[in-house]
Amino acid sequence: MHEEIVALRDRMDLVPTVAKWAHEEFWSYAGRTLEQTEVLFTPVPRDTWLPRTFVLMQSETPIGTASIVEHDLDIRPELAPWLASVVVDRAARGRGHSRTLVKFIEDFARDKSVEKLWLFTWSAEGLYAKLGWRAAERLERNGREIVVMNKKLVD
């Protein structure tokens, strides 16, 4: 099957799908509505590169998404930019799609001269560690233990 990664701002028809995935994985626990989550994925003007969301397509079917944002952790405003909202549709999991999306965002950031990228996770530390990300600190956020990780993109 043919796979490609497209910019969400070029495929506005995918916003409801991407927002639903992100809402189910990350935002519903915080009391945010699906409509509020959709607003997070409303594309920004084309003259800026942050934030950006990309969608992994298999033929014409969206199967995953990932974003790069300026800030993703309110208690660490000094850290930027962030890999965020990496989600693969449940039916497509276990096939390396998260890895594909993470590598794409890393390459995108590298092309923008980003030296270090950040993320936080409560459930995928092992995946990111396998991809070369390092744990920087452990915190509690919204009642969950999270790990803040980073990856140096340039030597």
Language-model features, listed with the residues they occupy:
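Active-site rim helix/loop that mediates acceptor-substrate recognition in acyltransferases
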Residues: 26-57, 63
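Conserved acetyl-CoA-binding loop of GNAT-fold acetyltransferases
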Residues: 129-139
